[in-house]
Every structure is written in C-alpha cells, then in structure tokens.
Amino acid sequence: MKLRLGLPKGSLQEATFQLFKQAGFELTVRSRSYFPSVNDPELEVVLMRAQEIPRYVHEGVLDAGLSGLDWILENEADVVEVADLVYAKSTPNPIRLVIAVANDSNIKSVSDLNGKRIATELVRVTQKFLRENGVNAYVEYSYGATEVKVPHLVDAIADITETGSSLKANNLRVIATILESTTKLHANKESWNDPWKREKLQNLAVLLQGALRARARVGLKMNVPGDRLDTILAILPAMKQPTISQLVNSDWVAVEVILEERQVRDLIPALKRAGAHDIIEYPLTKVIP
Amino acid sequence: MKLRLGLPKGSLQEATFQLFKQAGFELTVRSRSYFPSVNDPELEVVLMRAQEIPRYVHEGVLDAGLSGLDWILENEADVVEVADLVYAKSTPNPIRLVIAVANDSNIKSVSDLNGKRIATELVRVTQKFLRENGVNAYVEYSYGATEVKVPHLVDAIADITETGSSLKANNLRVIATILESTTKLHANKESWNDPWKREKLQNLAVLLQGALRARARVGLKMNVPGDRLDTILAILPAMKQPTISQLVNSDWVAVEVILEERQVRDLIPALKRAGAHDIIEYPLTKVIP
Amino acid sequence: MKLRLGLPKGSLQEATFQLFKQAGFELTVRSRSYFPSVNDPELEVVLMRAQEIPRYVHEGVLDAGLSGLDWILENEADVVEVADLVYAKSTPNPIRLVIAVANDSNIKSVSDLNGKRIATELVRVTQKFLRENGVNAYVEYSYGATEVKVPHLVDAIADITETGSSLKANNLRVIATILESTTKLHANKESWNDPWKREKLQNLAVLLQGALRARARVGLKMNVPGDRLDTILAILPAMKQPTISQLVNSDWVAVEVILEERQVRDLIPALKRAGAHDIIEYPLTKVIP
Amino acid sequence: MKLRLGLPKGSLQEATFQLFKQAGFELTVRSRSYFPSVNDPELEVVLMRAQEIPRYVHEGVLDAGLSGLDWILENEADVVEVADLVYAKSTPNPIRLVIAVANDSNIKSVSDLNGKRIATELVRVTQKFLRENGVNAYVEYSYGATEVKVPHLVDAIADITETGSSLKANNLRVIATILESTTKLHANKESWNDPWKREKLQNLAVLLQGALRARARVGLKMNVPGDRLDTILAILPAMKQPTISQLVNSDWVAVEVILEERQVRDLIPALKRAGAHDIIEYPLTKVIP
Amino acid sequence: MKLRLGLPKGSLQEATFQLFKQAGFELTVRSRSYFPSVNDPELEVVLMRAQEIPRYVHEGVLDAGLSGLDWILENEADVVEVADLVYAKSTPNPIRLVIAVANDSNIKSVSDLNGKRIATELVRVTQKFLRENGVNAYVEYSYGATEVKVPHLVDAIADITETGSSLKANNLRVIATILESTTKLHANKESWNDPWKREKLQNLAVLLQGALRARARVGLKMNVPGDRLDTILAILPAMKQPTISQLVNSDWVAVEVILEERQVRDLIPALKRAGAHDIIEYPLTKVIP
Amino acid sequence: MKLRLGLPKGSLQEATFQLFKQAGFELTVRSRSYFPSVNDPELEVVLMRAQEIPRYVHEGVLDAGLSGLDWILENEADVVEVADLVYAKSTPNPIRLVIAVANDSNIKSVSDLNGKRIATELVRVTQKFLRENGVNAYVEYSYGATEVKVPHLVDAIADITETGSSLKANNLRVIATILESTTKLHANKESWNDPWKREKLQNLAVLLQGALRARARVGLKMNVPGDRLDTILAILPAMKQPTISQLVNSDWVAVEVILEERQVRDLIPALKRAGAHDIIEYPLTKVIP
C-alpha cells in the first residue's frame, strides 16, 4: 500500500526536500522529472505547482499534499488539515494575502473598491472577500508581476506578501488583509478515513513537525556543583523539565535541557555566572514533546 | 506623443531586446524592473507576461504589443495585426498547439475525447476547438508542467510544442493540431486609427522585419573578369538584382549581391569555379527590399 | 615518517574531501594543484585519476590509495584491501560493470558476443570475463561516452552503471554483469608489512568507517517513566544496548540509543505512543561499535 | 537601548554572518544594503569596510566593531579590546604584515630600505615601523594588487600575508615582519564605561568565543565496563574532566567528554583498544568552559 | 622600442580589452596576472587600479595610461591629454563628481558645508573645490560604500555618479557638481617629447577613437533609380558625403553612406518611401573621418 | 546521400560549432546528446572524443572527421588530409608534443632517457620517436594530469603544450619536440574516392578555410581624391588588388581593399596622412581568394 503525496515544484522545492530529509525521507529527482524517488516504499511522491495540489487532493488523485491555505481556499478544496508546517520563510511573520493600492491613490478602504479593477492570482478568494464586504468590483486573473500593475493597468491588487518589502519597493499601500496563510499538510477525505493512510499521515506529521521544532531549538548540557543546582534550575525556563544525572564519585550533577535557540543568548552568560561549568550546546534534528 | 508598447517578460525577453537593438532601439532595464528605458523618446515600453499583453492591447491600456497568436486568441482580443515576427525559436518550424495523449492511450482521434479531462494553459482556445469538432470534454486550467499530467491526472493535454521533443520525452502522442502560432506585433484598434501612431507602428514593423530578414542573409562581393560576368550572373539566384560596378582602369567588374545564408554553401564553390576572385562575405544588420 | 596516500581527483574529489573532514582530516588544495595540504603531519596526499591509483600503489610509489575494485582489477594490481568504503553514490546499490547491447539487437547472451566488437574503459577486465566465458571478441579502449557507441560504432559495450538510467536513456539492454565494485582503501604489500604504516592505515580505516557509519545513524534520547521502561525497551531494536541513567530525585529514567536513521520514522511514533517524553534526535559524526 | 556594532563588508562578510548565526544571532541583508536586520532587538548592525570600522568606533559613531589589529593600529584608534576572535582563515597561522622585496633584490634587511620606495595599504603602521628602525623611506598608499608592484613600480611592499603563497607566486622574499594581526571585537571607550553596553559586549564575547571554541571540538560518548574505567580515564587528556554516569541495572558506566577535534584521530583507536564500546562522536555548537 | 601603457584593472578591464580588440590590439591575460600579452611588439601593457595610473604616468614609470579625469586631478598628475575616450558607460551622460546630502538634510548649498564632515574617495579634488568656494570642512577618505554613510557617519559625501540612480536609492540629494569626468588617454611629458612615442600614441588615439566612432554608426547601401537620386540625397543628412557609383548597363546608381545609428530609424522608412530599393545596413569596426 | 562527419566533443566543441556556424552550417545539440542536428541534409554529424575520431575515420565508420595530427598518428590511421584548420588556440604557435623532465633532473637529452619511465597520453607516437632515436624506455599510458607526475611517479613525460606555461608552472624543462600538430579535416580513403563525397568535402574545406581566413582580415573602404590615388595605392600592400570605382559627378574615387587585421594599425594612420577620407573598416565572414 502506498500514500500518494503531492509536493510543491519550484521555489519551495529545495526547502521541502530539506525538511523531508531532516524528517527522515530522502527525495531524489533528476533535473526535469516530476516523480522523485523516495527512500520509503510506502510513499509515492509527485511534484506539482503548489496552486494545483489542493485540487488534485480534493479530487482524490492524490491522497495528500503540501500547499498553502491560500491555494486550498482558492481551489475551494474540501480537504482535511493534518498539520500546520511553517518553513522556508525569511521571517517568523505569517504570509498574508493583502489588497494594496498606489501610495497616492484615493482608495482608502475596502469600500472604496466599488467599481474598480483588481488584479490577483487568487481570483475566487478575492471575489469572496469583496462579496462579504459588500463590494462590487472587477477581479481579473494575473499571470504574475502583479505588484507592478498598479496604477497603470489596474486600480488595486490582491497579492501575497511576507515582509511587505516588495509592496514598499513598488510604492504600494496595504488597505486590507484578506487572509493569513501557512503551509498545510492536507488530506483527501476518503484517504483520511482509511486507517492505514491516516496512521501514515499522522506519523508523517509527527516527524515533519519534530524536524521543524528542532530547527528553533538546541540542546544544552552543563556540569553543576550539587550546591548550585537549585540556583541553576531557577534560571532555566520553568516549563522545561531538565534531565539531571548524578556523576560518579562526585558531588557534581550533569544537567541537560532543550531550549529555544533565542533564549540561549541570555541564558548562557547567566548560567556561567551562576556556577555552571563546561556548558556545551549541540544541534538537534528532531524534537518531539 | 508616445506609443505605449508591451513586450514579453521572461524567457523571450532577452531575444526580444536583441531584436530591438538590431532594429535600432536600445532597451535597458534594471533586474527587477518592468519599465525599461529606451533610446527613443517616442516609445514607452512595459514588460509583461506574454499571456496578458493581448488583453491589455485589446482594452487600450497598451497601444500595441508583441505576443503569440495563441494568446491573442485565448484572450479573445480584437486587435490589428501589424506584422508577423519569427524569432527566438530553435527551428524554422512554426509553434503548434496540439492535443496529446499517452502513447498507449486508446484515444486515437479528437472524437474519442468525449467525456474526457484535458489540461491546458489555453482553456478557451481548446474549448472552442472541441466545440467546433462536436466534442464535449472537461477542460481544466494547468498552471504548468502540463506534459507530465498524462495519464495520472488527466486523459489528454493541449500544449504548445515546437519540435515535439518534450512530448516524445514524456511518451505522448499527438492526435490533433489546434492551431499554429507565431509572434505578432499587434495594435489596439483605436491606436491604429490615429495617424501618428499608425505611422510609428509601420516604421517599427519595417525596422523589426528588416532586422529579421538580415539574420538569414549575407552580403557577397567579388571581382569578375568582364568576359565571365554572364556566367557568374547565371549562377546567382534569378530574382536577386546584383549591383555591378566597373572598376577603374580595368576590364574587371565588381559584383555585389545579397543572398540567403543557406544558399552560400553551394554558391561560393560554384562562383569560384566560374572564375570569381576575391569573394568576400560580410554580415548585415538590416535588409529592406 | 609519512604515509603516502593517493586520493581520486575529479568527480569523486569533493565527496572524498568531505569524508576525510568528517573523519578528522582537513584537506585543502589550490584549484589546479594535485598536492593537498592535510592537518596530519603523518600523511602525504596526492590527487590522481582513480584509474591510475591502484597501479601506483602496486608499484610502491604510493603506500595506499582509494579506488574502485574495478580499477584495481583492470590494473591487475596485487594490493592489500584495508577497508571497504561506500560513499558518494546516489543509491545504496553497488556500482556494476555490465555488458549492454542495443534494445533491438539480436545479441541475447554473452555467448552471442563471439566475433563482435566491444568498447569499454576496462579492457582487461572485460577480456578476462569473455575469455572465462569462452567468448572470442574484439575489445577496444573507449575514451569516454561509451554508451552512445552502440549500435553505430560497436556491437556492445562494457560500462559502469549505478541505477541503469543512463543505459535506459540510450536504449541499451544489459545482457551480463561482469563485476560489482565499491571503493577500497588498499595498500601496497610492503607498506602493509611495516608496523607503523599498518597501524596508521588501520586507524585511518577505523575513522573513515566510523564516519560512514555515522551518516546512516542518529542519536535518540528520551525521558521515560520508570514503569514504562520495559515497554519502551521492547520497542527498541534488540541488538542495540541503550544507555539508561536514573534521573535525580525522580522515578524517570533517561534512555539514549543509537539507531539507523531509516528506523526512526517508525520508532518515533511508536515510542511516543508507548509513553516516551521529550524525544530528541541529534546528529552524529562518528560511530564506532 | 541598543548596541551599535560595525561588521566587515566584503570577503569576510559571509564568514562573519555564519559565526554570528552559530553564536545565536541571525543576520539577514538584502544584496546591496549595508544595514542587516538581526534577531536581537538590542543590536543594531552596520556593514562597513573593515578598514574604516576602528575609526568609527574610536569616534563613537559605533559602540563596537570587528576588525583586524592591523587596521586598529593604522587608524590609530584608541579603543578597548573586548575579545580576540580567530575565524575565516585557511590556516591556524596568524595573519602577518610583512615587508617583501623581489627575490633577486639586493635589499637584505630593513636597514637597506633607506631612501627606497615602499607601497602598502597600511601607510601609517609601516611608517611607524620604519621610524622605529631608524629607516627613512618613501611610503606610498597602494589601492590594491600591491604584490605585483615589485620591482617595476616600487622597491618593496608592506603587505598582509597568511600562508605566504601569494608572495611566493610573485617571486617576493620577506625581509621583516611588522606585526601579527587577528580580528578583534573592540569597543569605544565611553560605550565600555556604560554598564549596560559593557555587559552586552561581554555576553556577545562569551557567545562568539563559545562558538569558535566549538568549531575545533567534538563531543565523545562511550560505554565502558566498570573495571576498564581507570584505563580509559588514563588515556583521556588529563585536564578534561569527563562526565561519568552509572548505567541502570548494569556495571557499565557512560563516559562523556569534550575533546579537541585534532586529538580524536589518535584517541578513538586507543579507546577502542582499551575496551570502550559504542563510541560516538557528535558535533557541538558552543563550548563554554 | 616599446611604449609602456597602464590600463585599468577591475570593472573597466573587460570593456577596455574589447575596445582595444576592436582597435586592432588583442590583449590576453591569465586570471591573476597583471601583465597581459598583446599582439603588438611595440606595446607593453600593465594592469593597475585606475586610481593609481595617473600617478605612475606622472612619475614616468609608465609612458601613458587610461584613467578618468577625476583621478588625474586627484593625483595632481602633470600629464599630457592625448585623447578623450567615452566608453563602458550605460548612458551618454558624462560621469560627475557631486556633493550629496540626505534628502531631508538642512544643508542646501555648498556654503552650508562649513564645519561639516564629508566622506569621499577623492579627498584632494574635494578639498580644492571647497577651498575655492570658501568653505572650511573636514574631508575624510572613504574606502568604499560612500553613499550609505549619510547621515549616520558623515554629513555629506562627494561621490561619482552617472545616472544618479544609486544616489536616489540611498535618499540623497545633490547640492553641487565638482567636476565632470571622462576617460583620458594621457601621457608622461617626457614620453610625449620623444618623437617615436608621440607618433605611437597618436596612432593609438586614431585607432581607439575610430573604434569608438564606429560603435554609434552603421553603413547603409541602397540602389536608386537615376531620376530619384536628388530626392534621396535631399533626405540624407547634409554634412555626410555619400558615395555614389553608376551601375553597369543600367540607369540605377548605388548610394552608400555612413550614418549615426540613431538616425536610421527615421531614415530607412523615409528612403523606402522615396524610392530606394534593396536598402541594406551593415556593421562597422572603425570610422575615421 | 549523406556525408558522415565526426566532430570533437568537449573543450573544442564550442569553438568547432562557432566555426561551422560561420562557415554556414548551424549545429544544435541537446546537452547530453552526441548527435547534433545540422541545417544541411547532406551532412550527418557525430560528436566524439577527438582521440577516437581518426580510428573511426580509418575504419570507415565515419567518412571524415576533425582531429589533431597527433591523434591521427597515435591511432596509426591511414586517412586523407583534406584541409589544415587552425582555430581555437590562444596563440598562433602550433601545438607541440614535447618530452619534458624536472628542471633539476640530470636528463639533458633524448639519449639520457634510456631505461627511464615516461608517462604520456600518446603512447605509440612516443614509443616510435624513442625507437627512431635508438632509446629504450618504458612508456606508460597516462589518464591525465600528466604534467604533475614528474618527478614522483615517472622520470619524464611526453605531453601536449601550446605556450609552455603549464610546463613552466610545474617546473618542467623541455628536452625534445616529438611533433607539431594542427587540426586536420581528414577523410576515409574510400569515401574520398567517391566523387560526390569528395566534392562535398572540398566544398566544406573551402567554406571552413574561408571562414578562418576572414577572422584575421577586415574590409577597408575610403574615398580618395583622384590626384592622390597613386600615393594611396603605393601605401597599400602590393599583392592586394584593391577595387577602385569612380564616384558619380566627382573626381574622387572609392577604394576598397581586404587586409590582414594586423596591418591595419599601421595603414590607417598612414592612409589618413596620405589624404584618404572617410576610411571605414568593416568585419568579414568569409574570404575566398
């Protein structure tokens, strides 16, 4: 039995392959092929444009796939969300689908869009949003380079943005956010009802999320004199249960803890001052709570 | 006054810029910009996806543009064809939009497509063709990589092909040709009725076509003894009027002629045998008949 | 005293340097040089074509080298195999030297090769194989691109293949396997009899194999309630002795185990279900059993 | 409050960013920008030519910066050295500023430079050195490619060298060493007197040095039968305090130690012979003693 | 006898080599060398930073060199200008050295610079300009990236600009132009007084300028019926003397003329309308009036 | 009927394709293919290692091919030389096969090679040369990087050199030249006896040599007052017959001549001084005398 999985071709492909490799699945593909081989005989992978994956998952051509919430909605795909996966982005901010106009446009809010022309790659999501806001506008499909179409070709655009820097570079001003989007491991409904496929998907989710969690975390080990242990433990984040083991023939203990990487820059100097010795930090591949 | 011209962004861009440079128009653009500068104050150029240019020409946002006949038809754009331009292709064959199925499919002809699913980037052109052939099929928009969708995702595709080699590499078989397509310089109807814009467009057509014609031609000069002139002229292609000038203080004449490059490989050995001396071939930038 | 070691120049070089770096030996070489510097004063490294290394090891110009079994045999080199090293390949399948013919050739088996012409980079190995099979054929040295020579230039080829995909792409059919080959750390016989050199080579083998073993393995740590320990241990592969340590002031134990990476995808979900907490996976650089 | 930090633009930039990432600070910068963003709201980073950083630190435009001792001296910058950082070099040798002449020059020692012309990027440091040696020579500023100016343009050069290979390739001979230089984290004097900034700088130094220390070290774990422990401990470097923990229900102990990577190649074979089992080596990200 | 010529290393090198190739001098250089070989035994070429060439020409180490007027002035080099060469620029505008401040600075004119700090690569030229304008400011040498130093590090900069786009991208405003600069072939005064060297330099100037002139010009040939000749000649630019030759046995004439390329786009359509046939345009390598 | 032609794959391929394009034959090949398509239905082209082409021409598998004289001799191929083609080299010197030893070797002449070991890619040619010189040495086949084998692996090498710079960089000294080699268009003897194939080959030779001749030549045109014509003609190289035509209604004549490019740098200044006006130089594609 095999699980048929659609993964995004193109700009996300390398990041996706790296995530799967870290999760334990090695994908290899020849340059122009769309059918990678994978070192798990229970998986069959197809590369596709992210835009199309939810449609084919919905229709059952694929058991499951990775794509953004934006494209799941645009395809009106009725699928099961198995896991939320945040990767391959340059900031921790979510990706947003926003409506933007020229800086000097007199369109100030969504209601000003009545009767205007809007270019977007996500026509249906945009139309639905406008309808819900009681706005009647002409929404046209944009094949790309959407952000340069204002103001010469259209009055406004609905476009994906992460940091807003491309919008700023094109002198655009955001007037509304249609939705926030992250990558979803999503499944076909029938496939989800198959027990073998559901367990396979749940295991996949555990491994992928374990890999992502490990990216923002590090392992920390240190040796602590017995009488400094309480001080040290007080410094460590409360919710983390450190692993403490007694050293042989000694009144020192070894303390080991998993931390978020961004805490380390404050903790290491503090631990050192509090009497910890031989602090080492080591990298992690997976973290499962 | 300015003529607003849409040129294709992407894979055709470099070839288009080279053609315009040869025609006398130097376009320069910074890497992420869509608004090249051009050394002709009467032109304003916008880079766009070729798919969208006919739509914006039709609507009058652009006065004119370069795009394929396929996309003019897909956009149902009612525009004026100013010139046919054949460039940036690896063979002299026209580009074709064909319907293809898996080699081992039992779909043999268009009529077998009834009730089938077809993926294509050119949905309307394909639907129109099927309708005209009395076929009722489901045509879905493909965001790319169309040729790998058969047979897993769809039964057939309608895709652009030049040499057929990508179809062959994907084990596909052509069952019908929907249309042949070349690049067209096409104009908005109102712009065409403006005398200044029409003359500007006609001049542009002369220069672009003069540049393309020069690519397949070379200049040939040779010195010929007076008594061999008739023999030499008999060898040269009949329709070409060579330029003959008498040399000073000599009974030799200089013969100069413009030829198609592919004739040269047979003519040069023949001319040499017939008594021509000092044959030189030189490159051309434009040829206007 | 120094050990003189030949390493393969060219396509294997980067992978070899990475393996040595992981094993603890940093090699640096300027772009056109063949004499890398190495951070071990007891080693002297020469880069060479893999084809030539066994010959120079055999002759004692080098104490030892890395090359494939195929080239050791082709050079008829009488050397000591110190270690088998599997690296720098895209699949876990061994590399094979096979005899292949055109798909539509009427050569079906080795005996059909009588009187035929065969191109190969490994002339002697091929001749020996044919002789042992009672076949009399003309074997010619091929400087490269061997797989395109059938059927225009020769009747069959003897060529190296890993996945068979290049053979398939050239419409070739395998009719026999001459040998399977892996990379060997091999030594000159006299050098091997020198105690200092032998120990240096054995240590090198331990480190290189420890590095390779680590590539397919990961470290796994988890915290386990005392009463779940037996369940957890039952899930872990039997032959692996996990390291179990008691946590201070707690009835939990820490379990640590080294596993093959390909087992992890099944074990992690199972361990979690069985009550393990805070499972972390971390990367390894060397594993010595 | 923010600490304003100058980092070197150019050839050192990537290595610097990698070091900071390992230390826990992620810097991202768009291709032509000089103001990277950093995931620490207490830091403000500016990219600059290494030559200029000490000047701006001295003047208080920056609180601190990274630059070589050579440029601190050339700028006559009166700054506080916070930490010595050795990174981004191909060898462990220090970088030296040397005076070099043509191989066949009759300049043999510093005193022979009297009345000669010397090209260098470090004019003041060179002038000071000559003055201290009682030599009167003409020192001119070199914009680059200093090593090819001898002998046609100048008599000698004062240039930075690491391995000496570029000097050798240009047929130059070193006659004196002006100074040895490493990268310094250095601070403005007033900033150093501010308690918040001083602590921030000290923490930064701990993390950067912890990252650098980790690059040359590895973690080693092994299981040891109780009766072999003393033998094993005798093999391990004396100054390192290994972490020893008793295994549950067993008379084995787990021994864990942090070692310099260059010791490993001798220790692993020795430990194995002495009875250690399941030796694993794992990578480290930070080591704080 | 040889002429020793300094050519700019770096960003201008490729353009300079192309210009010399077109002028008839083929320069070849191995990647890290500064001494190209040239196919003229009378030339000896040295590659150098453009900043240093005028200094070495002034001092007689070189007979002549190519560098900008800006660097000739900065070096206070007393040299002979042999030829003005405009090449390797993206626009026909001259390069300018300008003083720029932040857009929102309250420095509005040169006189506002009193007491301010200015960064520049051309310290002496800037100081001289300020002195002549009665301004007393602190001018500091900038090693690069000058345009990002305003406003954090300095109050103003003096920097080279061609299109002004880098200044605009850094939100800078030009308040004064110090000088306009083009590339000069300049000679040492003594070398210029040597008759052989002077003639060599004059010939070099003719060839380099002939090559540059040819870049903006094309050759045009056409056949014209005798009775249309006057009309055609009236269309052609007055100052150009066309070459007219009578065709054999015909009342047509061949007209040939050299034109500036930018005239061609208007002339070709006009000539065609006026009765010219077989118009061809061909490229030129040198044009000497 | 088709002529089957072998062209060199690899480093010479691009230069060969450019030469054929200039000669009028456009070759296109997909990245991994060995069978280019060509716009001449009478040609069938195969790409091969240059080393193997003469063997397959000799055996009649190919009608003709391009390869060096060195490989024709090494293959002991009995073929017809159709044309000598000098292209794709960085200098006008011929390529030479030389015997080289270490600079400090005491091998001074060929006779000192008795009993020595020599590595070379051209074993037979080298053996024949040694035999003819009465020397008995061991010649071994080198798979590449031959020049670094001296002195550690062999006593001498026989290697191809063009400028000698690689030999110099490896501290080698040339003691003998075995042969000089250029690229030959060579034909199978039977193919040459076929009249159609012989004419096709002769035409090909005319076009290829015409293209090569054009690379070193330019066209020069100028206008000359009638009374200066003799002076001008006296300056032009004697053997070249210039084309002189009388200008209409004028006492000026137009002079046109084909020159070697290396003459132009002296002639243009001289012609200008002698009264020529409007001198233009234009590029050539073919020159057939």
From Swiss-Prot, chains A, B, C, D, E, F:
Catalysed reaction, written as an equation: 1-(5-phospho-beta-D-ribosyl)-ATP + diphosphate = 5-phospho-alpha-D-ribose 1-diphosphate + ATP
Functional pathway: Amino-acid biosynthesis; L-histidine biosynthesis; L-histidine from 5-phospho-alpha-D-ribose 1-diphosphate: step 1/9
Keywords: Amino-acid biosynthesis, ATP-binding, Cytoplasm, Glycosyltransferase, Histidine biosynthesis, Magnesium, Metal-binding, Nucleotide-binding, Transferase
Classification of source organism: Bacteria, Bacillati, Bacillota, Clostridia, Eubacteriales
Function as written in the Swiss-Prot or TrEMBL entry: Catalyzes the condensation of ATP and 5-phosphoribose 1-diphosphate to form N'-(5'-phosphoribosyl)-ATP (PR-ATP). Has a crucial role in the pathway because the rate of histidine biosynthesis seems to be controlled primarily by regulation of HisG enzymatic activity.
Activity regulation information from UniProt: Feedback inhibited by histidine.
Enzyme superclass (EC): transferase
Family to which the UniProt record says this protein belongs: Belongs to the ATP phosphoribosyltransferase family. Long subfamily.
Swiss-Prot/TrEMBL cofactor(s): Mg(2+)
Single GO MF descriptor: magnesium ion binding
HAMAP family, per database record: HisG_Long
InterPro entries named among the record's database cross-references: ATP-PRT_HisG_long, ATP_PRibTrfase_cat, ATP_PRibTrfase_HisG, HisG_C, N-reg_PII-like_a/b, N-reg_PII/ATP_PRibTrfase_C
Protein name in UniProt: ATP phosphoribosyltransferase
Classification via Pfam families: HisG, HisG_C
Gene it is expressed from: hisG
One biological process term in Gene Ontology: L-histidine biosynthetic process
Cellular compartment(s): Cytoplasm
E.C. number(s) listed in UniProt: 2.4.2.17
GO cellular component, one term: cytoplasm
